[in-house]
Design a protein with these regions (language model features):
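Short, compact, well-ordered microdomains
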Residues: 56-104
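Ser/Thr- (and often Asn-) enriched beta-sheet segments in non-cytosolic proteins
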Residues: 3-7, 36-38, 93-97
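Short, structured beta-strand/loop micro-motifs enriched in basic residues and often containing a Trp
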Residues: 2, 13-22
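Intrinsically disordered, low-complexity acidic/polar segments
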Residues: 15-17, 48, 103
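Short, Lys/Arg- and Gly-enriched loop/turn segments at beta-strand edges
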Residues: 44-55
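Short, flexible N-terminal segments of the mature chain
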Residues: 20-44
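Beta-strand elements of well-folded, non-transmembrane domains
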Residues: 10-12, 100
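A short, structured loop/turn motif at beta-sheet edges
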Residues: 1-3, 30-33, 101
Length: 104
């Protein structure tokens, strides 16, 4: 099983939607563009958002086991995926890449 690098590529915030539809929350997303996490196979990286992990864990698991080429040629690099979390108010886009390094 291989490790995967997860890089925060884009962080968006839709204040108009937040103001109109969201109840106030105590802790909003604190991901920063350029932030990098290493997934040790199927394990969620320490400090990584649980909701974002639930959106991407199947892709990480597939890549860590040598799979890829999602959706018949979707990504230029077949050992990668571009996934966003499911927060419609503050979506974050992540690049997931399989590494050559084995998971522990």
């Amino acid at each position: 099983m291989k490790k995967c690098r997860i890089t925060v590529m884009k962080v968006a915030r839709y204040d108009d939607l937040i103001e109109k539809y969201e109840n106030p929350i105590q802790h909003a997303c604190d991901m920063k563009e350029g932030q990098v996490f290493i997934a040790n196979g199927w394990e969620r990286p320490e400090g990584f958002c649980l909701s974002a992990w639930e959106s991407m864990s199947a892709f990480v698991l597939t890549l860590s086991h040598g799979g890829g080429d999602f959706y018949d040629g979707w990504m230029k690099n077949k050992k990668s995926a571009m996934i966003s979390c499911n927060d419609g108010f503050r979506p974050v886009s992540f690049l997931i890449e399989a590494l050559d390094e084995n998971a522990e």
